[in-house]
Swiss-Prot record:
GO terms for cellular component: cytosolic small ribosomal subunit. One of its GO terms (molecular function) is RNA binding. Keywords: Ribonucleoprotein, Ribosomal protein. The lineage of its organism: Bacteria, Bacillati, Bacillota, Bacilli, Bacillales. It comes from Geobacillus sp. (strain WCH70). The keyword Ligase does not apply. Pfam families: Ribosomal_S9. It comes from the Bacteria. GO terms for biological process: translation. This is Small ribosomal subunit protein uS9. Belongs to the universal ribosomal protein uS9 family.
């Protein structure tokens, strides 16, 4: 018998996460490594688990993730987005809960480019009156 799997793709900053939910005991594996080995910060681990906690499905599914691009924060956000999208395939009734928490919305904030004549995106060189 083929095992049931649910897929979701999440994006944040320059990170892209391909998430697979498989019925299991709650393991989270990112790029073939345990979540605690991959993500250094406890706060970011909480970010990743947020959709599972809100829908009360934390111990019901194994989460298998392939993520690339960006840093830890962007990757954690992308994984969260992917898990939320995959949970919608599990049960469409989760939509209001996930939507209220803002987990289905792609966070469009990305780093603004540096402009010529300025020191950063908006920071101008120091101005001297005299």
């Amino acid at each position: 018998m083929a095992q049931v799997q649910y897929y979701g793709t999440g994006r944040r900053k320059s990170s892209v996460a391909r998430v697979r939910l498989v019925p299991g005991d709650g393991r989270i594996v990112i790029n073939d490594r345990d979540i605690r080995d991959y993500i250094p910060s406890e706060a970011l681990i909480e970010v990743v688990k947020q959709p599972l906690v809100l829908t009360e499905t934390l111990g019901n599914y194994d989460v298998l993730v392939n993520v690339k691009g960006g840093g830890f924060s962007g990757q954690a956000g992308a994984i969260r987005h992917g898990i939320a999208r995959a949970l919608l395939q599990v049960d469409p009734d989760y939509r209001p809960v996930l939507k209220r928490a803002g987990l289905l919305t792609r966070d469009a904030r990305v780093k603004e480019r540096k402009k010529y004549g300025l020191k950063g995106a908006r920071r101008a060189p120091q101005f001297s009156k005299r």
